[in-house]
C-alpha cells in the first residue's frame, strides 16, 4: 500500500510494540515521548532492536523478526521502506471501529471495576518482585486487520478519527513462561482468570480529579487529597500488602474478561519489554525484573491516565535516581547493569518526556509543589522556624521556601548533615546493611513529620528562653534599627534605648514596624499549659519568661504611678491590679536587656518608648484569640540586672491589652509616648496642685459633659490644703470649664446651650416654687406703692456671677471668681438679651438661663396641674421623691407609671405614690388673666400712641399706633399707667410711646431718677441699655420691722416686677407666707418690698 494511503486507510504495516504504550498514553505529546526508550537505547549502541509479532499462528509464535530500520526523529521505528510499523487491532470493518469507539466513550464502569479503569491491559513488567515473564492478555483473532495507532482518541487532531483503539489490546506473540521466583509463586499459582486475592482500594490509583474545580494541569487532586497511607514500605510489607504481579495480572485479566475471551495460553511480556529497552536485553537472565511495569499503557476508556497513575507506586525503582548518590537498592544490585538505561539527566528533554510518561507522576505530586517553587528567586514569607533559627547555616539555599515540606523534613536531619539542598524531595534512608537508599520522604508518613508538625504548632518555651526573638511592638522596631546599623544585637538595643531619637524618625520606625508585624501573624499557638497558674512571687531561677505588655497600656492608669525614684519590691498580693513599672534608681541598667511595649510612665528614661525588660514575648495571635483578656494571665518574674554592682528589680505587671494591637493604633500610641517622654524631660517642676478629690468634686458639680484636660488635671497632692479654700478652687475650676464650653460654642457660630447653665443652677440652687397665691398677696398689701425704677431693659439684675455661683460662699462668689469668668457671662447673656426688644423677652431669657425652676414645671401650663390632697404622710427616701404631710395640697404634673405621680409641693418637684393622694376637682380661677387695675382715682390726661407696643407682662398695656389712651397716673419718669376707653384693658406703657394730647395739672408729677442700688454696676447698665424705659418696682418706705425675720441662704434674682432680690445673708422681714411656697416681705438691705421663694431663706 502506498505511502499516501496511510492517513485514510488501514495500514499494512504495524508499529513495533515498543511504541504501543507510549503512543497510547500520550495526550498531545506523542511525537515528543514516543522515542523515549527506543531513542535512548539507540543512543547507547546506535541501533534500535524490536521484536515485532506479525501474526499469532503457532508458527509465528516461535518466529521473531528483527528489523533494522533507520531512525527518523519523531516517528519511531519504521520498516525497510520507511513506513512506520503498526499493530493489530480487533476491528474487522470500519463500522465496527466506530461502534467500538462509541462504546468506549460511553462505557460506564462498575464500582468494582475501578482497578480496570486505571490499570492498563498491557504493561512493561518492571516490578521488583514480578516474574520475568508474565502472561499475555488479550490474544487477537487471526482474521484481524491492521490499523495504525498513533494517538489516543482524546486528542484534537485531524487523525483522531482513526486513532482510537479497540477495547481489546493489540496482539503479541506470547513467549514461553519461565518458572516463577519463589517469592512470587504463591501469588500467581491461582488461575490467571481469577480475580485478585483481595479487593484493592482503587483510590490509590485514581488520578483524574473528582470535579473540574479540583483539576490542575499536570497534577492530580486525588494524589493530593487521597494520598495513600504510605508510599514507602519495606519489601516484606509491599509483598504482603499487594503482590505486584498478581495485582497487575489480575487487572489485565479482568479487563480481558470484560472485552473478549482470550485465545491461547497467557504469556509473559518480559522478553518484549526487554527487547524494547535494549537489544541485548533478552540474553541476560533475570534482567526483566528491572523494568517490570515501567510503563502502564492507557486504554481509550481512561484517557486521563496520562495525568499520572500508580506507576511510582508500582515501580519505585524508576523513580529513584541512582545518579543522586550512586548506591542503588540492595534489591536491585543483581540488575544494576541495566540501571544505566534509566539514568536520564534531569534537565534533558528526555527526562521531561520521561516524567510526562508518568514515571514520576504519582510521587512527584508533592515534590512539584515544593521543588518547582525553588526556581523562583523570590523568598517566601518567613515562618516561625525562620524567626527562631535565623542563622546562615540553617538555610544553605536562600531561595528555598522555608515552609516547604522538604525544608521542614531536612530540618529534622540537619543534625546528620544532610548533603543535599533543602528543596530536594529525596532524603537518604539508612538501611540495616549499611547501605543508604535514596527515597522520597512521604508527606504524612515521614518519621519526623509528626514531630515537625508539633514543632510548628506547639513551640517549646524552653527553647525560647534564651532566644533573641522579640515579638513585641517596640522590640521589633528596635530590632529593625539594630539590623540597619549592623551592630551587635544586645549592644545595639541598649544604645538605642538611650539615644535621642529625632522626631522625624518616629513615623519611619513605626512604618517599618507595620511591615514587621505582618510576620508575627505566623506565630504559632503556644498552648495553654504555660499560661496556667499565675504567681506573683518572683521566681528564683530567673528562667520564668517575662510577659510583654501592650502599648495601649499607656493611655490608662497614667495617674497611678508614684515618683520614679521610689522602687517597690514584688507584689505580695494576688490581686491582678495594673501597676506601673518602676526602678530603684534614675539610671537605666545596661546589662542583658530587652524591650517591652508596656506602659512606662513610671520609668525614668530619655524615651519612654524603650524599656529594659528581660525575657521573650509570648503574646501570640492565637493567644489573643483564645483569651478575652490575655494579658491578665501573664507571668510574673524577677529581672535581676547587674549594672555597676547594683541590683535593679523590675516589677513585671499585668497589661491592659484586651486584644490585637493594630499597627495604626500602635502608630498613634507610640507617637504619643514619644512626645510625652520628650515633654516630661524638659518641663519645669510642676506647681502645687489642689486635692485630687476636690477636682473630682468639681467634675461632679459641673454639668458640662466633658472632662478636664489632662495637662490641667491634678496629678498629685503636695500638701494638705485647707478645706474651704480647696472647695472654692474646685468650684471656680468647674465654672471655668463652663465658660470654656460656652466660648467654644460661640466660636462655632451658635449660641450657648441654655440647658448647660440651667443644669448648673439646678444642681446648686433649690427649686423655685411656682407662683400662685403669692401673685395676689402683694396686691392685697397696703404697702404696694411704686417707687423704685428698674434697669433700662426692664429686668432686675444681680451681679453677673450671681446666677452661676449658686451655693458658693460669698467669698467664692465675689472675690474668687475671676474677671474672665464674669465677662464671659456678661457677654453671653447680654448677646442673648439684645436679640430681643421687649422687657418680657429679657426676663424670660434670664429665666431660661438662670432660673432654678425645673424645666418640666416651667413648661407645664397651669391648666395641666391637677390638685390632689395627701391622705398619708410621705417621706422622701431619695432626692427624686417629694415629701409631704397628710392634708397638704400637691399639684400633680404627670403620671410616671401606674404606681407613681410626679408632682409639686411648696415649690419642689418630685415623685410620690399614687395611693398617697386623692385628686381634687380643679378649683375655679382665683385671679383673672391680668391683675385688676389699680384703684387710682381720677385721670391725669389723655394720649395718642405713636408706636406699637406689645405687652410682655400682665401689668403692661399693649398699644397700637393711633390708639387713644386715658392716662391714669405717672408711675415714674418713663412709665405711664393708663387704660383704653371703652374696654377693661389697663396697664402701664412707656412714656416715649405716646404723645400727650391732654394733661390735667392735678395728676401730673415729675419723679426724679432713683439712686442705683450698690449691687448694680454702671457698666452692666450701660452694656444692656436700650430705648425702653425702666419698669417700676414697689417698695415699702416705712419699714417698721413688724414681720418675722428670715435670713437669705442663697442669691436670688427676681424675674417678675413684684419679686424681691435676695443676696446671701440678707435679712428679710416676712409679712405673709403664701400656700404656694412664696413669702412676702421687705429686705432690710434694699428696703424693697416683694415676694421671694420661701426655701431660699431660713428663720432667724
Curated annotation (Swiss-Prot):
This protein is called Sorbin and SH3 domain-containing protein 2
This protein's species is Homo sapiens
Q: From the UniProt record, report the name of the gene that encodes this protein.
A: SORBS2
Q: Where would you find this protein in the cell?
A: Cytoplasm, Perinuclear region; Apical cell membrane; Cell junction, Focal adhesion; Cell projection, Lamellipodium
Q: Which domain of life is it from?
A: Eukaryota
Comp. bias (Pro residues): 167-180
What UniProt notes about the protein's domains is: The first 2 SH3 domains are required for WASF1-binding. All 3 SH3 domains can bind independently to PTPN12.
Indicate, by first and last residue, each region the UniProt record lists as having compositional bias (Polar residues).
30-52, 134-147, 812-824
Q: Where does tissue-level expression of this protein occur? A: Abundantly expressed in heart. In cardiac muscle cells, located in the Z-disks of sarcomere. Also found, but to a lower extent, in small and large intestine, pancreas, thymus, colon, spleen, prostate, testis, brain, ovary and epithelial cells. In the pancreas, mainly expressed in acinar cells, duct cells and all cell types in islets (at protein level). Tends to be down-regulated in pancreatic adenocarcinomas ans metastases.
